[in-house]
């Protein structure tokens, strides 16, 4: 008898826009599961296009980047539903990995800092230096690399 699959929910925030993000996320998940011999159950939720939100039965939640302004959607149905879901996940202590646009929306919603348009867009692969020692980051090198291609930034962190 095999072990239960790892349940992974991906919240697709691309709103149908052409992108490489979803393909890369699928490839990384499949490569990871194949290398480690883990069975996975992967479900994609079209959050912006169809207001689809996963339940809380998953082991891993990834919420993607996406196009557009994280400032202009606060009253749109998908955004209201998404931020209520984020509040619920926080209340039940379920971690969610937020990528770019998703992180910016969470920062705006929880007032974690000022979300604003950058003066110029930077594109490239940049080094990231780990400052926190936590089990979550085990296996990462002290310096790892991330893709940089955003138009918005979070500044002036709200420490309260």
Segments (PLM) and residue ranges:
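N-terminal beta1-alpha1 cap of cysteine-dependent amidohydrolase-like domains
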Residues: 1-79, 83
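A structure-centric signal for secondary-structure junctions around beta-strands
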Residues: 5, 39, 58, 93, ...
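A structural signal for short, well-ordered beta-strand segments and their strand-loop junctions
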Residues: 10, 44, 97-100, 148
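Catalytic beta-strand/loop cores that center a nucleophilic Ser/Cys/Thr
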Residues: 139-160
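Short, flexible, glycine/charge-rich loop motifs used to bind or transfer phosphoryl groups or to couple energy/partner
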Residues: 50-53, 86-87, 118, 134-137, ...
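Short glycine/proline-enriched turns and hinge-like loops at secondary-structure junctions
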Residues: 54-56, 109-110, 140-141, 159
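Cysteine-nucleophile active-site neighborhood
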Residues: 67-134, 145
């Amino acid at each position: 008898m095999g072990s239960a699959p790892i349940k992974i929910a991906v919240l697709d925030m691309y709103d149908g826009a052409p992108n490489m993000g979803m393909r890369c996320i699928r490839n990384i998940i499949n490569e990871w599961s194949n290398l480690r011999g883990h069975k996975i159950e992967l479900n994609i939720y079209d959050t912006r296009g169809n207001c689809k939100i996963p339940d809380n039965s998953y082991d891993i939640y990834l919420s993607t980047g996406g196009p557009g302004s994280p400032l202009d959607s606060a009253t749109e149905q998908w955004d209201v539903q998404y931020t209520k879901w984020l509040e619920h996940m926080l209340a039940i202590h379920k971690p969610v990995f937020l990528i770019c646009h998703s992180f910016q929306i969470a920062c705006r919603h929880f007032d974690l800092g000022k979300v604003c348009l950058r003066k110029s867009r930077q594109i490239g692969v940049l080094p990231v230096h780990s400052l926190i020692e936590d089990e979550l980051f085990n296996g990462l090198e002290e310096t790892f690399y991330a893709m940089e291609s955003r138009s918005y930034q979070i500044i002036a962190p709200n420490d309260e």
